[in-house]
């Protein structure tokens, strides 16, 4: 009982105090003498809230740009001219981990690029919308779901005109994995897939569904970009099996506006850190 109390009460102290009718302690400094003391320490450096927000956005973009790493750029394929249209492949493109207020489509269009509208709508509102990564650990270990659940190539091919919409575009395969605080990844995929050949794989490598899509892209396009969206290091030993993947770029957790910086790296307006 004592052990349970020591474990459960501290993180829920405010709730326990409320139930017992206790008040949290505090310090009344209203009678403190302030003569000769500058009480306006920490003066705001902005005249308006809008100016503060603009500065926060600029800082977010700067930090994101400096954190993005260009891991591979064979033949100098990147940067791209802004008359390029990109096809963002995988459900992770529309559910980018750690990118919230500005999505990939908006960021790249704002940078002057074209974005494959048919493919974007397929993942965001069409027959590809119900796929995507599991949440990882639930409530710090109460349960876990590390399923990958990527939309299969067969579903993409069954959609009239979808694969044709990718012609004359540069495909960007978004490879995402859930990782971070409270999300210890599984040693294998045994409990997170029904596909036998994937059960012995790790979470940090592509599963059979992803590999089938990557093979299709490799066979049908001469320039493919691999975009990594993971806060954990991933296994990239397989990349050499797909010679059409000329560019690999790592852009984990971009924050609210960081995808704008990613688009500017694709255009050459910003430089990645590596």
PLM regions and their residue ranges:
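C-terminal non-catalytic regions of proteins with extracellular/luminal or membrane-system context
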Residues: 1-274
């Amino acid at each position: 009982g004592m052990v349970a109390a020591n474990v459960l009460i501290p993180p829920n102290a405010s709730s326990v105090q409320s139930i017992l009718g206790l008040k949290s302690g505090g310090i009344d400094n209203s009678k403190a003498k302030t003569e000769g003391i500058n009480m306006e320490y920490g003066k705001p450096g902005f005249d308006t809230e809008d100016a503060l927000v603009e500065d926060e956005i600029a800082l977010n973009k700067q930090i994101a740009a400096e954190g993005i790493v260009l891991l591979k750029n064979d033949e100098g394929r990147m940067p791209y001219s802004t008359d390029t249209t990109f096809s963002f492949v995988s459900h992770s493109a529309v559910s980018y981990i750690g990118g919230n207020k500005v999505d990939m489509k908006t960021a790249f269009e704002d940078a002057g690029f074209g974005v494959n509208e048919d493919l974007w709508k397929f993942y965001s509102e069409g027959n590809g919308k119900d796929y995507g990564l599991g949440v990882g650990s639930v409530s710090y270990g109460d349960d876990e779901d590390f399923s990958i659940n990527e939309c299969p190539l067969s579903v993409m091919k069954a959609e009239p005109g979808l694969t044709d919409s990718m012609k004359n575009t540069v495909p960007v395969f978004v490879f995402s994995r859930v990782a971070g605080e409270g999300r210890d990844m599984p040693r294998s995929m045994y409990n997170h897939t029904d596909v036998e050949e994937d059960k012995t794989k790790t979470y940090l490598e592509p599963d059979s569904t992803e590999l089938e899509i990557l093979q299709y892209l490799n066979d049908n396009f001469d320039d493919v970009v691999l975009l990594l969206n993971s806060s954990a290091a991933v296994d990239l030993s397989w990349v050499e099996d797909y010679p059409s993947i000329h560019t690999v770029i790592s852009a984990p957790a971009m924050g609210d506006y960081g995808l704008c910086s990613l688009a500017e790296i694709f255009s050459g307006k910003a430089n990645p850190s590596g």
